[in-house]
Amino acid sequence: MTAISDRFETLKQNQECALIPFITAGDPDLETTAAALKILDSNGADIIELGIPYSDPLADGPVIQAAATRALQNGTKLESVLEMLKVTTPSLQAPIVLFTYYNSILHRGIDNFLEQVAAAGVAGLVVPDLPLEEAAGLLKPATERGIDLILLIAPTSSSERIEAIARSSQGFIYLVSVTGVTGMRSQVEGRVLDLLQKVRQVTDKPLGVGFGISQPAQATQVRDWGADAAIVGSAFVQRLATGTPAEGLSAIAEFCQSLKAAIKTS
């Protein structure tokens, strides 16, 4: 059983929904990123998603795009992120999932990339622009190294595609709550419930909902609809980038606690 599967199994036994915060590596710097990972880990995060800054982030909304731009301007590179993780992950309880684009993987070579991320203690990968037809080439070598390849299902995915993705995805399945990019929205769209029900009919794997969740009430809503995890990105990235690094770290600690409290079953 992988670290992510093990975490979901424990949560299931406790009838708990997972909280998965997202932050961008290197914004404002890697020292703050390491501190943020530890703070999220100790304030309610069950799994943590770490975005690798990329120059052409097609799936990211304005908040995360701006964070990636700042990180790249600071000289953040995948190799330096992995060096930071190698030192940081041994002290974390929450498994780390890297959010990275496919070109970054191909540029380094799949085997070389996976060796590096495995050595850094990474538990899973989300690759938003990975075509399902090419997923097998990454899935097999990742699985051999104990790394879960987490695939995405969008509201526009056909029934056939949903079944294929559900079969292949490891760790959990990432349900995209909206058509479009990441970002904060005032409410979770009702069709998320339809998507959850549709996917649940074909798999018993954990289902995480992301893209657009920014408030505790929204996290509670997706939990009540049957999601196994609430994934929150832009709202964390924005808080971490506000004020000094110390103020940002304090803000994400408080926010993480409020989200976890909101999705804990009474």
From Swiss-Prot:
Known InterPro entries for this protein?
Answer: Aldolase_TIM, RibuloseP-bd_barrel, Trp_synthase_alpha_AS, Trp_synthase_suA
Q: What class of enzyme is it?
A: lyase
Give one Pfam family, short name only: Trp_syntA
Name the catalytic site residues: 49, 60
Q: Name one GO molecular function term.
A: tryptophan synthase activity
Query: What EC number is given for this enzyme?
Result: 4.2.1.20
Could you state one GO cellular component term attached to this entry? cytosol
Question: Which of UniProt's keywords are assigned here?
Answer: Amino-acid biosynthesis, Aromatic amino acid biosynthesis, Lyase, Tryptophan biosynthesis
Pathway listed for it is: Amino-acid biosynthesis; L-tryptophan biosynthesis; L-tryptophan from chorismate: step 5/5
> Could you tell me which NCBIfam families the record lists for this protein?
trpA
What's the subunit arrangement here?
A: Tetramer of two alpha and two beta chains.
Briefly state the protein's biological role: The alpha subunit is responsible for the aldol cleavage of indoleglycerol phosphate to indole and glyceraldehyde 3-phosphate.
Family named by the database record: Belongs to the TrpA family.
User: Protein name, please?
Assistant: Tryptophan synthase alpha chain
Originating organism: Trichormus variabilis (strain ATCC 29413 / PCC 7937) (Anabaena variabilis)
